[in-house]
Amino acid sequence: MADSTDRRADATRQQIIRAAAHQFAQRPYHDVGLDDILTEAELTKGAMYFHFRSKHALALAVIDEQLARAGAAVQSLVDRKLSGLETLIDVGYLMAVEDICRDTARAVLHLLPVVGRGEGLQTTVLNNAVQALSVVAERAVAEGDIVDREPQDLARMLVALYLGLRQAGDLDDPEQFLRQIEQGFVVVLPGMVPNDRIDYFLQFIRRRTALAVKTASANPVAADDDRAG
């Protein structure tokens, strides 16, 4: 009986998070009311307050949910044992497809500057991303695919490049957004990669762009974490 109750409670919690993610993905945080979320979730305020004390707490839960998912997805890429630079490129396309296909991913980038800034969460998340990518960048330098650069500087540049493209791009035009990601890589590649390896990585980027376009086209945006994975 206890297990059944726990499963129902967890299902309700996920239902609320999905509805909140969809709302936060579409509109600014301050424009979303609890009634909007509860109407979409088809639940009462009592059900929500059992799990979340406030809209702020719910927004933090959406962020935590996506960060856990993204962390696991990036670790899965690292575990594939591709070269360091191939992995860095794959991480960029993974993030792009997540942002295109998942409400939770879209919501997080909307929420972090608003909800995360005051508590230092935004800084922590970005610093953690830079640190994680620095480890992969260090491997890429050791493998000779990236010229001798400070791995943390490379990681920070890649994070800034993606966030800038994300801010300026249109996720509702997936192919255009992914082509912009491709062009971003093409622009920075000559400053990172030895001349004798540029052609290989240009071809790798083209293949990854085509794969990402295909994946994004097959997975319309969804809050459900099972849809685009």
Annotate each language-model stretch with its function.
Residues 1-27, 31-43, 56-60:
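Basic, helix-initiating cap at the start of DNA-binding domains
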